[in-house]
C-alpha cells in the first residue's frame, strides 16, 4: 500500500493532520498491505481519538487552572542553582512560573542553551572558540584596575595582558574601542592607558568611569558569561544573559536547536508560534524540575490563550484579564470601581454571554447542560403519539 492510498483513506476522517501522517508512516513501516486490516486500524484509531476529545460544554479553562494551580502550591518559592549547570543561577519554581504567565519582557535570570553544529559540537577546543566569540568582552573584563588618578587628573586603566591574549585582543583594539565611543585623549604606556578630558574635574572623571568600564570590545552584547558542558555525545554552551538574534549570526551555532528562556525575545526573533511552543516548554520544564507532572493539554490551553491575538499577552489585568468583552467580567477580576465607572460613563451594554457575568446576575451559565436548549417536538404539542 502506498502513502497516497493511505492519505486518500484518511483525508475526510476526524483525525488531525499530524496524527494522520504519523498513522500512515507507521502502517507503511510495519508493511501492512491487507486492506481490511488497514481499515480496522484506521477505525480503531478514530475510536481512540474520539474518546480523548473533550465533551462539548466542558469547563476546560477551570480544569486547566486547577490542574496547574494545585501543583503550583507545592512549588518552591526560592531561586537556586539550576541542577544541570552548577555555575549558573537560574530562576525556578513559583517565581519562574509567575514570570512566564506575566509575559515579562526580561526574565530575572535570562539564559540561553546554545547548540553547536558540525565538528564544533564534538571538539571541546572548537566549542571554546565559539564560546569566546559569543561571550561579551568589555574594558572591565580585560583590566586589572580602572580608577581615577587625582594627581594626573585622568582615568587610569591597567590592562591584564593574559586576559587580552586569551580573548585574542591587543592594547590597540582597546584604544580604538574607547576612541570610537568617547572623546578622550589616550596616552599609552605598555599595558597602562591614561584617559584625559579637556576640562578635568573629579566629578567629570567619576561620571565617565562607569561608561569606560562598560565599553564593548568583542562578542555578543548582554552575554555576560558562557560555560561549556558535555551533554551525552556533544558539547552545549550555556550563557548568562540572552541575545538570540546576534547569537544566531555566530559561526558554528545550530540555529535550529538554540533557544532562550526569554519568551518575548523568541516572539520578536522567531514569531508567535515559536513563542507559544516556548511557553509550553518552559512551563513543562519548570513543573518537571519540581517533580510535578501536568498534562500538556492544560499548558497548551494557557499558551493558546496568551498568543491568540498574534502577540504574547500576560494573564492579568494588563493582558487577557483586562481585555474581556464583558464589563462585569472585567470588574469581577480587578479594579472593580474603575471598570464600572468607565462603563456607566460610556453607556456600555453587557450581553451576558460569558460565565462570570451570568454568575454575577444569577443566571444559568452557558456550560455543561447550560449550553443545551431543550425543545419540545411539534407532534407532542399537538397531542399525537410519538
UniProtKB/Swiss-Prot annotation:
This is DNA-directed RNA polymerase subunit Rpo1C. It is found in: Cytoplasm. The gene is rpo1C. It comes from Methanococcus vannielii (strain ATCC 35089 / DSM 1224 / JCM 13029 / OCM 148 / SB). Keywords: Cytoplasm, DNA-binding, DNA-directed RNA polymerase, Nucleotidyltransferase, Transcription, Transferase. SUPFAM superfamilies: beta and beta-prime subunits of DNA dependent RNA-polymerase (SSF64484). InterPro entries: DNA-dir_RpoC_beta_prime, RNA_pol_Rpb1_5, RPO1C. Pfam families: RNA_pol_Rpb1_5. GO terms for molecular function: DNA binding; DNA-directed RNA polymerase activity.
Amino acid at each position: 500500500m502506498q502513502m497516497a492510498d493511505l492519505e486518500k483513506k484518511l483525508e475526510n476522517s476526524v483525525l488531525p493532520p499530524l496524527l494522520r501522517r504519523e498513522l500512515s508512516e507507521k502502517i507503511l513501516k510495519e508493511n501492512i498491505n491487507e486492506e481490511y486490516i488497514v481499515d480496522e486500524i484506521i477505525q480503531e484509531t478514530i475510536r481512540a481519538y474520539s474518546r480523548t476529545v473533550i465533551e462539548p460544554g466542558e469547563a476546560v479553562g477551570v480544569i486547566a487552572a486547577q490542574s496547574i494551580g494545585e501543583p503550583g502550591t507545592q512549588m518552591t518559592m526560592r531561586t537556586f542553582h539550576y541542577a544541570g549547570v552548577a555555575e549558573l543561577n537560574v530562576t525556578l519554581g513559583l517565581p519562574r512560573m509567575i514570570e512566564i504567565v506575566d509575559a515579562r519582557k526580561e526574565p530575572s535570570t535570562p539564559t540561553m542553551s546554545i547548540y553547536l553544529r558540525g565538528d564544533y559540537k564534538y571538539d571541546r577546543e572548537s566549542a571554546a572558540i565559539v564560546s569566546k566569540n559569543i561571550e561579551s568582552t568589555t574594558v572591565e573584563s580585560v583590566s586589572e584596575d580602572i580608577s581615577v588618578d587625582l594627581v594626573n587628573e585622568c582615568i587610569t586603566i591597567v590592562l591584564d595582558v593574559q586576559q587580552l591574549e586569551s580573548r585574542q585582543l591587543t592594547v590597540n583594539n582597546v584604544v580604538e574601542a574607547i576612541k570610537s565611543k568617547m572623546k578622550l585623549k589616550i596616552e599609552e604606556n605598555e599595558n597602562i592607558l591614561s584617559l584625559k578630558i579637556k576640562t578635568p574635574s573629579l566629578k567629570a572623571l567619576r561620571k565617565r568611569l562607569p561608561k569606560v568600564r562598560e565599553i564593548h570590545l568583542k562578542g555578543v552584547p548582554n552575554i555576560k558569561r558562557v560555560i561549556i558542558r558535555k551533554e551525552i555525545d556533544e558539547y552545549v554552551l550555556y550563557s548568562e544573559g540572552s541575545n538570540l538574534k546576534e547569537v544566531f549570526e555566530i559561526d558554528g551555532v545550530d540555529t535550529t536547536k538554540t533557544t532562550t528562556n526569554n519568551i518575548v525575545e523568541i516572539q520578536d526573533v522567531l514569531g508567535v508560534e515559536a513563542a507559544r511552543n516556548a511557553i509550553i516548554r518552559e512551563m513543562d520544564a519548570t513543573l518537571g524540575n519540581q517533580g510535578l507532572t501536568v498534562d500538556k493539554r492544560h499548558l497548551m490551553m494557557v499558551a493558546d490563550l496568551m498568543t491568540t491575538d498574534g502577540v504574547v499577552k500576560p494573564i492579568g489585568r494588563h493582558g487577557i484579564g483586562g481585555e474581556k468583552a464583558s464589563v462585569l467580567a472585567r470588574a469581577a477580576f480587578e479594579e472593580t470601581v474603575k471598570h464600572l465607572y468607565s462603563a456607566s460613563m460610556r453607556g456600555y451594554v453587557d450581553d451576558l454571554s460569558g460565565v462570570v457575568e451570568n454568575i454575577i446576575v444569577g443566571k444559568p451559565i452557558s456550560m455543561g447542560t447550560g449550553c443545551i436548549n431543550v425543545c419540545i417536538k411539534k407532534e407532542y404539542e399537538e397531542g399525537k403519539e410519538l
